[in-house]
Amino acid sequence: MDTYTKRERTIYLLGMLGQNLIYGVIGTGLTYYFQSVIFLPALAISTITLLSKIAEFLCDPYVGMRIDRSQNTKGKCRTYLIFSPLPIFIFSLLCFLNRPYTAAETSTARLGILLAAGLSFIGFGICFCFGDVALWTLPNLMTKIRKDRNALLAQARIVAGICGAGISLLLLPLSQAAGNHFSKQRNDPTFGLQMGTVLVCGSFLFLGTLLFQPVGFCTQERMTAPPAEKRSLWQNLAEMWRMQSYRRILLSGLLRTPSGLMNLLQMTVLSYYFGNNGRTPYVHYMLLLGIPAFLGQLIAAGAAPKLADKHGAATTFA
């Protein structure tokens, strides 16, 4: 058979859903947790995020190089998809198991909290990079038919968009509702909000891992290629920099940085300004903000493959 089965397609899309659940929890929930639950300093959050992005920037080409060189009998991508979900879950959960910064009484304790937050977040980013690169590369190996490959990637983008929008809308209100419940039981708002956030985010992380894990076991790679020639990481980076398309992608990522920062800030603004940190309903404001953005992503994800087939990928994405 030259292409994937319906079962493989379903498992792959469920895995994409699970992976984006995990990513959404970290992207939305962890920022809120750092800022509004354990009260890390803004400078510390910025530094941790910067270091994590640098680690991911170096990790991406390294993982691609490892996948190209792979000669494993399970396939180039499946090995990473089998072994990456559990470390991703462990590091993502560790990100939420930290003491409030304001509860530390000594500088050593405060430094320990910052180190724990930074190491767990950077560890998550590195582990997630292995799973992410393998997951998005897998459709190229699951089928020999270009039309089927493009269709699967388009469906994956739609699933990722739906999941991202859903987790953004649900995560903070659910965490704050659970936090208010625990706060009333313990008469301690800080402890209650921390417990509520850990419970809700941990549940989503566990569900995402359950959906993500089967992809490596239940899919098949049909495209085979000889291992790529061995080159160092720096040789690969130099080769990529000589490619005009790579420089365009890098520039595009830099230009999108402000919008990414806005996405991180908007949930905090909505939660505090409109929702009084969970004490006032504010979901309708989130819907007003999120629905247009979600529809735009959905339309773009569905239209991009068709435009690429008609006009060429270089023209469409230039």
Where are each of the predicted segments found?
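Membrane-embedded alpha-helical bundles of multi-pass transporters/translocases
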Residues: M1-A318
